[in-house]
Swiss-Prot record:
It is found in: Secreted. The lineage of its organism: Eukaryota, Metazoa, Ecdysozoa, Arthropoda, Hexapoda. Residues 21-66 are annotated as: 3 X 16 AA tandem repeats of [FI]-G-G-G-L-G-G-A-V-G-G-R-R-R-R-D. Probable toxin. It comes from Doratifera vulnerans. The modification Glycine amide is found at G31, G47. This is U-limacoditoxin(59)-Dv128. GO terms for cellular component: extracellular region. Residues 33-37, 49-53 form a propeptide. GO terms for molecular function: toxin activity. Residues 1-20 form the signal peptide.
């Protein structure tokens, strides 16, 4: 169980670094919407909703809600 959590955290950190590098392109590509920051990109990629901060992005990624 711990290994799964660690793997998830690693994946999220890699996505966050990609977001910082590509300016939200990854989130836009996967979520189908424009993203300009790390939180928005992450939320758009997994939750498919607009997010403008890291907390919102995480919420969109996990629950698909604000």
């Amino acid at each position: 169980m711990r290994h799964l959590l660690v793997l998830l955290l690693i994946c999220l950190s890699v996505i966050a670094m990609a977001q910082a590098t590509f300016g939200g392109g990854l989130g836009g590509a996967v979520g189908g919407r424009r993203r300009r920051d790390i939180g928005g990109g992450l939320g758009g990629a997994v939750g498919g909703r607009r997010r403008r901060d890291i907390g919102g992005g995480l919420g969109g990624a996990v629950g698909g809600k604000s």
